[in-house]
Amino acid sequence: MTKKKAFTPLLYLVSIVFLPWWLSLSFNKSLESWVNNWWNAGQSEIFLNDIQEKSILEKFIELEELLVLDELIEEYSETHLQKFRIGIQKEAIQLINIYNEGRIHTILHFSTNIICFVILSGFSILGNEELVILNSWTQKFLYNLSDTVKAFSILLLTDLCIGFHSPHGWELMVGSVYKDLGFVHNDQIISGLVSTFPVILDTIFKYWIFRYLNRVSPSLVVIYHSMND
């Protein structure tokens, strides 16, 4: 009975870790054909935001300039003009296909993330007892660590998250999440998140040290500041 009681929270922990990945993969595979059919069968007007429109226009202008340059290099004849028009049409169709694939990717990932969020929320509510047990195990594990190990772990974590070299890591992580959610890549928004989010985390962390650690373990705070200096 005790082994079963201890095994259940571990099984729940493994499910929490691997369930999002499995759900995302499963729903992507199952919804992909349906979203493709729905998008291709739809006759709705295409809406482009400023970023998408600018990106497509830049690609098309770049393509047109390359083809014009190619025509200037070759002999000027009716055959070459015909090839030029055909090349423009083919590349225009390719750009439209790229746009359609991007929109399908956005719809697919947005729908998948909503479904996964709902399922994980229900999973967390139903597994409240297991969460309590896991929380007690975590607290017991942290309590048994020495203050030096705790201070070192806190210092390592903060340096990784809000240290001098952390912006590049944040940029990769935010960009990955941004892409996974199905949004169009935007350097300005990503740069804004990278420049503000670590600052907010740093403020919250300092407040946590001031309010919680000073009261619970003053020696840990002293060791942390000594190692940080």
Swiss-Prot record:
Cellular localisation: Plastid, Chloroplast inner membrane
GO cellular component: chloroplast inner membrane
Record-linked InterPro entries: CemA (IPR004282)
Residue ranges that the Swiss-Prot or TrEMBL entry lists as coiled coil: none
GO biological process: potassium ion transport
Gene Ontology MF terms in the entry: antiporter activity; proton transmembrane transporter activity
Topology versus the membrane: Multi-pass membrane protein
Annotated keywords: Antiport, Chloroplast, Hydrogen ion transport, Ion transport, Membrane, Plastid, Plastid inner membrane, Potassium, Potassium transport, Transmembrane, Transmembrane helix, Transport
Reactions catalysed: K(+)(in) + H(+)(out) = K(+)(out) + H(+)(in)
Transmembrane segments: 7-27, 114-134, 154-174, 189-209
Protein family membership: Belongs to the CemA family.
Function description: Contributes to K(+)/H(+) antiport activity by supporting proton efflux to control proton extrusion and homeostasis in chloroplasts in a light-dependent manner to modulate photosynthesis. Prevents excessive induction of non-photochemical quenching (NPQ) under continuous-light conditions. Indirectly promotes efficient inorganic carbon uptake into chloroplasts.
Name of the featured protein: Potassium/proton antiporter CemA
Gene it is expressed from: cemA
